[in-house]
């Protein structure tokens, strides 16, 4: 699915991979089917810098927490934990920090990962449009 609207929101099918497993796959030391992954319907949030995943998905993928930082979020200033993941939408992938959110929250794809993969949101249709990755 290239993206679709649900009550004014844009969702995509996204695959989040453990970055260490994925690196071993790229190096030919692991089969793709052996890479820890989570296939999720994620909300495309162009107001969010980074993707965000619920804590239970972070744990399932075995993503280590890299740091905890003070950040400006949709709910105000708060401390957030950051992990690292590989994200795939369609045939494109990106490595990105991922914000750890409480269990049960909606997975998000933020603007940095979208730009790394060359996607933009068509506001008229609510669908993702493929273009060139932004490497500015």
Summary of predicted features, one role per range:
Residues 1-136:
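Pepsin/retropepsin-fold aspartyl endopeptidases
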């Amino acid at each position: 699915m290239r993206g679709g609207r649900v009550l004014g929101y844009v969702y995509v099918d996204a695959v989040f991979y453990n970055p260490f497993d994925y690196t071993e796959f790229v190096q030919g030391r692991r089969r793709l089917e052996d890479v820890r992954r989570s296939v999720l319907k994620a909300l495309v949030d162009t107001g969010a810098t980074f993707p965000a995943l619920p804590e239970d998905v972070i744990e399932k993928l075995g993503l280590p927490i890299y740091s905890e930082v003070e950040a400006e979020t949709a709910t105000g200033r708060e401390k957030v934990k950051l992990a690292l993941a590989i994200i795939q939408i369609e045939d494109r992938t990106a490595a990105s920090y991922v914000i750890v959110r409480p269990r049960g929250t909606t997975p998000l794809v933020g603007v940095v990962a979208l730009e790394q993969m060359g996607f933009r949101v068509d506001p008229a249709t609510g669908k993702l449009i493929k273009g060139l990755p932004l490497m500015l």
